């Protein structure tokens, strides 16, 4: 058996060097381990009995650790009446150690102030409750002041909280658990994670600045708040929520307005967001001494302690925080909607830019984007000045130079656009004329594939128009979906559908059984009725049955819900009257999904002539010359002459000028060359006479026997003129009478 001070052994070393630290060594046989009483930062805590050399027994606390790090080293350097006393170390089983300290009979301050014993303590001791508050606050401040200013090395506790302050049998506060503490050899130390969320300072949460003694000052303010309110700080919030409230929103613990000014100011000075603005422990200790010496303030604080304002103020703060959370959630959702709209807008703009690089073949269909890209391409060959090209592009958009305007531009117009160099204007005018000439030359000569496509489109439209009656009746149905997220939050969206008034109203010749075939586009606009501002981006969708606005809208029913929805229905080209229908409704309740309105609409349809055929003048396509030197695919609806259309149609279908295909014409010619009988019976009562084809012998002279007879019988000037002549005016073959004909070998 040995005393705590007589026997010393080497048990640990510092983290930064090989310097060996000596701790009082207590024999394991002298220690009897008792019940488990708590958990420290890096080990479990047990009660126990220590047999002293004189045979007496002492109740102790044993903290079991795996490695002797900073805690034992720090405890061996400090000794103060308000800091737990360190006795030494004891070797446990294996490589474990026991840190032996004094035992606090009343447990932690946290357990005491939240127990029934705390409620009866003031009355049983004969004093007032605020006297106890000031006494405990002074004792804790005295211990922290010793660590900061009077110890061998400046020590930052870093985990000061009511659970790390214990009470002995005389209800004296003692600071314990130095597992996360650090020596402060300079003005600050590097930040590292340690502590408990509700008691942590902003700089420890963010780990953005070096830690100073001001970190413990923040935690001390929270402990003082616990003693006064007897409430758990940030009780209903998660650690992440606490970190966000402190660092991002700057929300500190609630202090009732009825709190006396000196006490309120003391806690506020501990919770400054900037560490250097906080009070130090010496200033806090002095303020507590002045507070205890002012009886008037003490009476005022005692009266305040009897009120229930803490709970009321905490509940009020919770409501404000919840409202702030909902506002942040709304803002987040709005930002997501805006981000989605921005991405959609960027996607559309990119599509416009891509479309500008591939303009339609019809120059009259060009937009400012197509014109701008075309002009930039042409001018880019003669000028490499980007600023110049940007100015010209801006002028094109400012003056709305579309394809139709581009074809009619002059050199003066180009100069007005900012093309001041003569060479650039000449080159641009040359390309504009070439563009116009190409457009004009190809105006009536579309490709066969394009002409066929246009004719088929027109044929389909005419057939569809002829299949419906002149007038039809449909019903437009506007409604809304509602989803209940929780007691107060709702999500909703609107929809539009259509149907025939009655099943008997469906046109008999209609191929489509759906009334939505008469609707082209449906647009939704949702506005706040109170502010008249849009809640989300207006959305349009092509009708293919039932349509809805794409995004869900989230609102809180606690607010005054008053939403205006505008549904605009645009009809297909086949509908002549009305061209569109608008449904406006105001929604004041979001309890359930429902139909807002059923609007009956009478539609008048366009009809086409039944005698219309494909040969009706149809639009054709004129390719456009592009500065890149190739033709683009596109459509331009113009009209060509019937002769040209007939020629292109025959060429497309493979027919010749006789109205026959090449195959039919070849077959007929073959039949004519083949000998056949004079008569061929096709039917019993029908006889077709086919003349017998005989091959006549070709004559080599025009004064043959047959010719002479013919000329004798018909000696007219016309017959003489019909005689065959060769070049030079003489007969093809002319032999003298009596001479033999020439022989051909």
UniProtKB/Swiss-Prot annotation:
InterPro entries: Kinase-like_dom_sf, Prot_kinase_dom, Protein_kinase_ATP_BS, SAM, SAM/pointed_sf, Ser-Thr/Tyr_kinase_cat_dom, Ser/Thr_kinase_AS, Ser/Thr_Kinases-Pseudokinases. Keywords: ATP-binding, Coiled coil, Cytoplasm, Kinase, Magnesium, Metal-binding, Nucleotide-binding, Nucleus, RNA-binding, rRNA-binding, Serine/threonine-protein kinase, Transferase. SUPFAM superfamilies: Protein kinase-like (PK-like), SAM/Pointed domain. Residues 735-745 have a biased composition (Basic residues). Residues 693-745 are annotated as: Disordered. It comes from the Eukaryota. The active site is at residue 159. Gene3D superfamilies: Phosphorylase Kinase, domain 1 (3.30.200.20), Transcription Factor, Ets-1 (1.10.150.50), Transferase(Phosphotransferase) domain 1 (1.10.510.10). It is found in: Cytoplasm; Nucleus. GO terms for cellular component: cytoplasm; nucleus. GO terms for molecular function: ATP binding; MAP kinase kinase kinase activity; metal ion binding; protein kinase activity; rRNA binding. Widely expressed; expressed in most tissues, including intestines, muscle and the nervous system. Residues 31-305 form the Protein kinase domain. Residues 307-352 form a coiled coil. ATP binds at residues 37-45, 63. Its EC number is 2.7.11.25. It catalyses: L-seryl-[protein] + ATP = O-phospho-L-seryl-[protein] + ADP + H(+); L-threonyl-[protein] + ATP = O-phospho-L-threonyl-[protein] + ADP + H(+). Disulfide bonds: none annotated. Belongs to the protein kinase superfamily. STE Ser/Thr protein kinase family. MAP kinase kinase kinase subfamily. Stress-activated component of a protein kinase signal transduction cascade that promotes programmed cell death in response to ribotoxic stress. Acts as the proximal sensor of ribotoxic stress: directly binds to the ribosome, thereby acting as a sentinel for colliding ribosomes. Upon ribosome collisions, activates the stress-activated protein kinase signal transduction cascade, leading to programmed cell death. Acts by catalyzing phosphorylation of MAP kinase kinases, leading to activation of the JNK and MAP kinase p38 pathways. This is Mitogen-activated protein kinase kinase kinase zak-1. The lineage of its organism: Eukaryota, Metazoa, Ecdysozoa, Nematoda, Chromadorea.
């Amino acid at each position: 058996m040995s005393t705590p001070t007589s026997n010393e052994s080497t048990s640990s070393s510092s983290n930064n060097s090989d310097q060996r630290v000596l701790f009082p060594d207590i024999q394991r046989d002298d220690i009897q381990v008792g019940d488990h009483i708590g958990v420290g930062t890096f080990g479990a805590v047990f009660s126990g009995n220590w047999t002293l050399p004189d045979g007496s027994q002492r109740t102790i606390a044993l903290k079991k650790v795996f490695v002797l790090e900073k805690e034992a080293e720090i405890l061996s350097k400090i000794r103060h009446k308000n800091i737990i006393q360190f006795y030494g170390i004891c070797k446990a089983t294996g490589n474990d150690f026991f840190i032996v300290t004094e035992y606090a009979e009343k447990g932690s301050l946290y357990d005491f102030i939240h127990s029934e014993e705390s409620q009866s303590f003031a009355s049983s001791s004969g004093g007032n409750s605020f006297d106890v508050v000031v006494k405990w606050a002074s004792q804790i401040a005295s211990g922290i002041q010793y660590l900061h200013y009077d110890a061998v090395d400046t020590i930052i506790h870093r985990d000061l909280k009511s659970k790390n302050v214990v009470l002995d049998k005389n209800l004296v506060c003692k600071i314990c658990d130095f597992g996360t503490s650090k020596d402060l050899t300079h003005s600050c130390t590097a930040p590292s994670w340690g502590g408990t969320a509700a008691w942590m300072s902003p700089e420890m949460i963010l780990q953005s600045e070096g830690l100073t003694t001001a970190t413990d000052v923040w935690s001390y303010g929270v402990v003082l708040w616990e003693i006064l309110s007897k409430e758990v700080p940030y009780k209903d919030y998660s650690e992440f929520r606490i970190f966000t409230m402190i660092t991002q929103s700057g929300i500190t613990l609630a202090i009732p307005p009825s709190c006396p000014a000196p006490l309120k100011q003391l806690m506020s000075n501990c919770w400054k967001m900037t560490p250097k603005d906080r009070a130090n422990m010496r200033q806090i200790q002095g303020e507590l001494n002045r507070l205890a010496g002012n009886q008037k303030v003490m009476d005022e604080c005692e009266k305040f302690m009897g009120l229930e304002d803490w709970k009321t103020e905490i509940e009020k703060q919770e409501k404000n925080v919840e409202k702030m959370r909902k506002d942040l959630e709304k803002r987040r959702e709005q930002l997501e909607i805006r981000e989605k709209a921005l991405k959609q807008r960027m996607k559309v703009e990119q599509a416009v830019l891509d479309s500008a690089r591939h303009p339609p073949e019809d120059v009259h269909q060009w937009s400012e984007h197509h014109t701008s890209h075309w002009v930039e391409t042409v001018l880019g060959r003669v000028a490499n000045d980007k600023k110049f090209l940007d100015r010209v592009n801006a002028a094109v958009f400012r003056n709305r130079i579309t394809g139709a305007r581009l074809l009619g531009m002059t050199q003066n117009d180009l100069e007005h656009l900012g093309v001041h160099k003569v060479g650039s204007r000449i080159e641009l005018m040359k390309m504009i004329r070439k563009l116009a000439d190409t457009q004009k030359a190809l105006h009536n000569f579309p490709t066969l594939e394009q002409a066929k496509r246009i004719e088929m489109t027109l044929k389909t439209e005419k057939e569809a128009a002829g299949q419906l009656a002149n007038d039809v009746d449909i019903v437009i149905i506007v409604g809304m979906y509602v989803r209940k997220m929780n007691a107060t939050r709702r999500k909703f969206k609107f929809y539009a559908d259509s149907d025939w008034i009655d099943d008997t109203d469906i046109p008999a010749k209609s191929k489509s059984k759906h009334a939505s075939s008469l609707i082209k586009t449906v647009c939704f606009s949702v506005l706040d009725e109170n502010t008249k501002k849009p809640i989300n981006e207006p959305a349009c969708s092509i009708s293919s049955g039932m349509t809805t606005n794409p995004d869900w809208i989230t609102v809180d029913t606690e607010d005054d819900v008053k939403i205006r929805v505008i549904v605009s229905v645009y009809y297909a080209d086949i509908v002549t009257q009305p061209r569109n229908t608008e449904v406006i409704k105001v929604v004041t309740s979001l309890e359930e999904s429902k139909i807002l309105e059923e609007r009956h609409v009478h539609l008048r349809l366009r009809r086409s002539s039944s005698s219309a055929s494909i040969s009706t003048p149809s639009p054709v396509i004129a390719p456009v010359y592009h500065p890149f030197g190739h033709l683009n695919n596109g459509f331009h609806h113009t009209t060509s002459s019937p002769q040209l259309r007939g020629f292109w149609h025959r060429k497309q279908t493979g027919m010749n000028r006789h109205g026959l295909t090449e195959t039919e014409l070849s077959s007929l010619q073959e039949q004519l060359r083949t000998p056949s009988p004079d008569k061929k019976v096709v039917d019993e009562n029908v006889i077709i006479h086919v003349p017998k084809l005989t091959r006549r012998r070709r004559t080599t002279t025009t004064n043959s026997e047959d010719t002479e007879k013919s000329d004798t019988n018909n000696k007219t000037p016309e017959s003489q003129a019909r005689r065959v002549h060769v070049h030079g005016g003489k007969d093809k073959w002319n032999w003298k009478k009596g001479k033999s004909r020439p022989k051909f070998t």
